[in-house]
Structures are given as C-alpha cells and as structure tokens.
Amino acid sequence: MSKTTKQFQTEVKQLLDLVIHSLYSNRDIFLRELISNSSDAIDKIRFEAHSNEELLEGNSDWKIKLIPDKDAGTLTILDNGIGMTMAEVEENIGTIARSGTKAFMQALKDKSATDNPELIGQFGVGFYASFMVADRVILETRKGGTASDGCRWESIGDGSYTIEECSLDRRGTEIVLHLKDEFKEYLEEWKIRSIVKKYSDYIQYPVVMDITRTETPKGVDGEEIEGAGTIEKTVEETLNSMKAIWARPKSEVTEEEYQEFYKHISHDFENPFNTIHFSAEGISEFKALIYLPAKKPFDLFMADRKKGLQLYVKRVFITDRCEELLPDYLRFVKGVVDSSDLPLNVSREILQEDVQIKRIQKSLVGKILSTLAEVKEKNFDEYVNFWKEFGPVLKEGLHFDYANKEKLQELALFESTATEAGSFTSLKEYVERMPEAQQEIYFITGDSRATLKISPHLEAFKAKGYEVLFLTDPVDEWVVQALTEYKEKKLKAVDRGDVDLDSEEEKKEKETKQEEARKEYGDLISFIKSHLEDRVKDARLSKRLTDSACCLVADEYGINANMERILKAMNQPVPDSKRVLELNPDHPIMKIMTEIFRENKEDARLTDYADLLYDQALLTEGSPIKDPLRFTRLVSELMVKAATK
C-alpha cells in the first residue's frame, strides 16, 4: 500500500487545535501520557500471551525506552507492547468514537481548563498531547503475531495525516516527536528524569534511557589510573523504581505518591477525596489500593461508560476494567486489586462466577462503606461535599444491594423542610427530631427543592410540625421502593394515598366537622368527579390541605407525577394511571361552587371552575396542562369579571 493522505475526523481537528493553542501550564504531561500508553500496550500483550504465546515472538524483555536526540531535535518513545494494525491505528488515532469528545472540548474551552491540561488524559485522548510540544509526530507500529506487516503514521497536526504500510522486524510501537524549538529542554537528561520520577515512577515496567558518562579508567584495585585520560561510556539506565505502590507498606508511601498514582490510573486532575490502602489475608488474599474521587466524572451516568478496577494476579496484569470487583453503584471508584488466589489465565466467564472474586468484592464494598461512615462521623462537612457529587449513585445501592442496605441507609443524606437549601440531614437525625406523636418518616419526591418546598401536599405536615424529606434525584423513586422502613419507622410519601395525622382525640373532635363537609359538598364533588372522569380516578375532600384549593394524589403504590416525568424523559412507557383530585373543604372556592351548583347545575361556570382546579393542581406539582390556551383564557375572563364587579 502506497502512502495515503487522510483527513482527521472533524472532532479530532477541533481537538488538535485546542490542544496546540489552549493548553500551556503543564506540558510535561505529554510524556506521562505516552509512557502510560506504552505500559498499557505491554499489559495487553502479557495478558493475551497467556493464551497465545506466539505473540511474544521470543521478546519478553519488557521495557519502555526513551531516546533523546539533540542533533535531530527528536524524542522517541519505544515499547515492545502489543502494537497496532493499520486499521487499529486509524481507529484509535484518526477518529474519536467516544461520547465524551464534545464534553472534553467544552471543558477545554472553559477558562479554568487551560490551566488543567491533565484533562486530556481524563477524556481518553492522551496521544494528542504530543502536539503540545511537537510540530511533527511519526508513529511506527506492528502488532504481535503479524509477521513484518507494520504501519507508519505521520502528522504535523494540521488536520491531516499520512498512513502507509512498512516492514518492521520488531513488535510494538515507536513514536518520534520532532520537538518545537521552544521545547528542546525535553531532550535534556535532567528534564526527562524529573518527569519520569514525578509521573511514572510506579510504572511496573522499566522506563530506560541510554546515559553517556565520562569516566577515568580504573585499575584492578578500583582506583583511577593516573594519567590514563578519560573515556566516554554509554549504559542503559532504568529511570523508575518499578515497585508497585499497592505492594509497598503504607508507611513507605508518601501522600504525593498516592496522589500521582491516582492521577495515573484515573486521568483525573484533582487529588482524590479519600485513599484506601489495605491487605486482606485468610480465605482470600489480596492487596488493594482504592481511591474515592473528589468530583464526579462527566460520563458517570452514561450507559457506555467504562468502569471497573484494575486487576492483577501476583503482579501480572489481567485487565484494567474488572467490573465484577465492585457493584454498579460504586462504579466511580478507582484503584487496583492484586490477588494471590486467582489463576493467571482467568477469563471473563471465570471472573463472573469465581467465588474468590465474590469474596474480594464483599471485602472491598465493606471497606469502602466503613471508610465513608468514618468520614461522615468525623468530618461531616467533607462528607456532604462528597455526597453532593456521588450521593445519587450511592443511593442506587439501597435498591440493588440488600446485604449492605443498613450501612447504606446510614450513609444517605437528604434535604428536608427542616434544613436550609444545600444542607442535609440523615435518617438518624430525622428520627431523633420526630415529635412524640409522629409515627412515620415523611418524604416527597420531585425535580427540585424549590418546587417541593411550595407543594400543597406539605400543608398539613407543616401545620403539625412534621418534617418532610425532599427527594430530588431521579433514582429516589426506585430507592423508596426498597427503603420502606428505618428503625421501625415506615417511610410514607406525602403525595400518595390517604394521610392520617390526627390522634384519636383529634379525630373525634374533627369527625362532626368532616361529616358536615361531606354532606355540604358531596353532590358537588360527585359532579366534579363525573366531569373529570377521563382525567382523575376520584375526587374527594382532603385531609392534607390547609391553604391551597386542591392537589392531585397518587394511590399508595401508584405512579405519581414525578415518576411519570422520569419515565417519559427516559423514553419508557408510562402505565395508564389517573390520580385522585383532593379538594380543600375550607377553601372559599368550595362554597362559591356549591352555591352555583345549588342554583343551577347546568351553569357553565361549574365545568370551567372544575377544569381550572384540575389544571391548577397540575401546575402546582410541576406537570404540564393539556390546553394552556383555554386555561389562560379562563383565567383572563375571571380577572376581568373580578375587576368589573
């Protein structure tokens, strides 16, 4: 195949432009990214060689070599990893088939992002960091097991690249960076050493470089030979310690080392919220270095998001995405697990069924949850910041992880009628504040605190001094299906079913008044129910309203307005369900409508008012009305009539 010139995908062109012109505060990370890519490539061939040893081609002296050439002005990164085919080169470099590309470019456009070039690794496009320091990049690669069918790729970062076949004896990848004049310092030994030490010291493969030293010859006694002159000697030196950070005692690892390793495996640019480093012995033996991030990633709720911990078996890399090590509600957790018990030829099927994996998962989950409980106890403000980022994900565990339900419900935080905006309460604190007469834990679900705070469903609870939890995350609708009780107190939705807040004594006092209201408004309510029969399941007098005229209430186990909105937003089918229209017997509109009804049951105002009440109930719960034009016309007519009386 002759040399072919191709255009980058549109997104890559935009990305290259941003990388070249916007990132400037820490260009050192280009080398970290390329070394990390080489390390990943060696990981992959070691793993694949378990089932196909021929891929090694007799070359298993793993290393990543850095070759600075001051005369040519080039820095070369060479590895003997898995390599790539021509198709893989085009797929991995010529295009970006990743949903996060636009989010990455938007982040770069933000002013703050120009000071955080580490973002480039976070979004999985680390190779392009080369163009921060180079005006020409050449890549030559051959995949293991493909004879001499190599590939040469070249670009000057102008939106196009050339690609052609080439003959390569060696397996792996070589990247040659033609450095811009202002970045020739990256050819200096001291500069390369400092970058490798800072960012790649823990890479488990040797990062090597030829070092030339001037020496005076020594005699057999080890002393320099007088008058012998000097000679130049070149040796290949290893620049990194290669000691797996998770295998070292905690006392020997500095905070800076923990933080740099986290950034290496996560491509995050912030320090982690918490670091968990421990060893497990007994039935299942493993070492783990686990990180809880400080900020949620942009793709946390994307279905195709890559997740899972890195898995090693006796220091041998197995996979960087072992999803079986943690449940899905902990998918934001980063880290490494190194097991002593799993077989080296472990397969995906084995991972899904292996009893050791299940034991490791149980231990990891327990350690993570206990760590969070400790932070919550000792530094609540810090924990609140973490909860704001990851609370919606952690709450998924209340629905799916029955074994850890009690631990998770102690970690859960909620806003409520008793907290300020942005402040939270736990279920334990809620129960401790409950008045003696209160029997249940009350909550309401919706899309925001602002909407829920003015909900008419809260009126009776406010009057009684009963606190109501605000559940504003979409996942909460599923959470409350599982979290039905806490400390023998049942959880009750204030917008579902009937409410019974009165004591027996209060019920007796109100019974006469309620009976009178039923007699006075019974016929009117029957009329309203009949008129709205295609929209409501029933109409009845309310025990929960004190100020508002009406509200809509779902059945005890029915679909409420918030669940309807969520299902529609997810393009899921919404079951046919009508709610109950509750009417406030103490509201003046009830007396007005009753007087009209007694005078003339055919009065058009009755149907207009019934429609207005229903639409009003929809609006107060945040639901759309079906005929906004008619609604506004009726309201306008009422305003005119009121003004001309």
Swiss-Prot record:
Region annotated C sits at 566-645
Keywords, comma-separated and alphabetical: ATP-binding, Chaperone, Cytoplasm, Nucleotide-binding, Stress response
What ranges does the record give for the region B, renumbered to this chain? 349-565
* InterPro entries, per database record: HATPase_C_sf, Heat_shock_protein_90_CS, HSP90_C, Hsp90_fam, Hsp90_N, Ribosomal_Su5_D2-typ_SF
Q: Where in the cell is it found?
A: Cytoplasm
Function, as annotated, reads: Molecular chaperone. Has ATPase activity.
Q: Which family does it belong to?
A: Belongs to the heat shock protein 90 family.
Know the name of this protein?
A: Chaperone protein HtpG
